């Protein structure tokens, strides 16, 4: 069988995929062909010889090139029978370590002249090798050439045959290099780099195919004969690759230098990055660099070029671009270069190194400067994708996540302080909740991949705690009033218990940030008292649900008084049942009356005084007092008329009867109009003994207004319903029942008018809180000193600040210490003035 010459370079393009793989494998296709061609020749061989030949089907080249060397040690005697198996040993060496050695030694290239057949065999072999290298047809079959190689090796001429073959391949590689020199004379540029790569690609496309065919012909020499010698000789494939390396990349390991091929490859990659069409064997040439073991040198060159390029890009773009646009550009560059490397490089380390280099140059070196360019606008945009891109790119850099966290904290404080300073009271809590919801959305959507999520959440908590407590008393008051609105029966925004529970949880989060929780408690207690006394609570279960959440946050000591308020309400219901039994026992008419007996310790402080109660109401109150004395051993009750309410049956005119839900003061005032048609403020005060300010407040409520029931009207001005002048003018007017009352509902609730200003109410709460804080400071000092017996001032201050749950100044603590010294709970140490002793 005669083998045809390999196709020429021009026809190899149709087999580009096969040739690309030929640089990575040992051309199993060629070896398979060889096995078929040799099949006819094996019939005349011994079994031992067949075993040797059959080893040609083994795969020896891994991923495109040999990284192992072989050497043969031990007994290699050829005087035994031909079917005695030769012992072989494989010695592994680093090919690159040998790259700096001199070219393969040629040794003695004289074929033994005593055997004319050896010379004739070499002549045939060399002619056919030249034919393969020169793309000519071989004159001898591959089986015949294989037999001649075996014949020469059997005559102990293996080393000489090896050297002569290497010399031919060296000359062939030099001829290929000379064909490339014409192209290398032209200066390299982006517009001609593809031509250079195309020429180099053609050279590499042909080289491994030809030498692999030659290697298969000399397979016996490569696997058997050379392995039996005592010298360490490179396998043919490794030797041929080393020849290519030394020819086309001379001295590359002695001193790193960028070859023209490296520059051309980089230019082609940059053109691809700029979205220009590139027609060059880029992947094939990168594979070639791996095959001839210079890929690491190219990787160093590529990294240095990328570092220079992207450093210049960063310097140019950072001053001109905002944070979002710059991060979008960085992500695009990283993704596209990563894809380019994935397509053209097999080594995972190449992708990792390129990504790290681009990230370092574009982002690591730009932090924290780029984060100051419209960072707030990026967060304000609520674009989870853009914010997430910025965060994910920064967190890949050393200290990047910390910088984002710092900028995010500044943003939160800036926006939060602006809300505290500019929002009106009625909108502040809702704005804070909306801001918190937005930030939570960013945290879960954009920052979910944080390397340290605990620090990220702590950053959020610290920022909110910072600005919520900028005006701590105001924040505490408004948050408590927000709870009052949620739990009030007039709240129309709550459709079911689930919605209410969710809204309460959101408000609890704001409450958690408060430092002055005792201020919140004071306001919350007032709101709760109003809801309970006036029966305006949306649900007792909802009230207790909130109480449970507050207890979970702050402990039972915080909710002790609030829980006591509910205990009083439950006890009052029980008293109501017992009171009805008492009336029945005393043969008195059952009264439509409910009393709330409260423990002063639990409830807000209220001013109490006696007023003139109409007889029909006074008798019932007297009966309840008698009942309570019976129940509690002559203990008396004190009535808080300002907290009471009543239902009045009113007849404004024939056919117009209504039920009015009014406060106790409003009820007493309205009942006066059964005695006389007109009354002045002064007359009402005189007959009821109600404070003038309370009379004015309740008369205003009865006069009503827009969208409010007008139970009374002014006499002066023809019964004008218009409220004119000040409170002083109101005192000089007369009032009469509005006979034209037109409310459509049968039961009408009369609204309350609060004349007391917010400043006055705040002052009262502040005084109450300060008084309560004094007791808490005193108790904490005594508790600490009782346990420690003696402490210096600084240690005592430290332990106090750890135990107290509200903000307190050192001046306030010093005042309480002086008070305790005066009351002889503690004393100063006579030997150390800065220390205190506990007084038993």
Swiss-Prot record:
GO terms for biological process: DNA damage response; proteasome-mediated ubiquitin-dependent protein catabolic process; protein ubiquitination. The lineage of its organism: Eukaryota, Metazoa, Ecdysozoa, Nematoda, Chromadorea. It comes from the Eukaryota. It comes from Caenorhabditis elegans. This is Cullin-4. Keywords: Isopeptide bond, Ubl conjugation, Ubl conjugation pathway. GO terms for molecular function: ubiquitin protein ligase binding. The gene is cul-4. Residues 1-82 are annotated as: Disordered. Component of cullin-based E3 ubiquitin-protein ligase complexes which mediate the ubiquitination and subsequent proteasomal degradation of target proteins. The functional specificity of the E3 ubiquitin-protein ligase complex depends on the variable substrate recognition component. In association with ddb-1 directs ubiquitination of cdt-1 during S phase and is required for restraining DNA rereplication. Probably is involved in ubiquitination of cki-1. There is a cross-link at residue 786 (Glycyl lysine isopeptide (Lys-Gly) (interchain with G-Cter in NEDD8)).
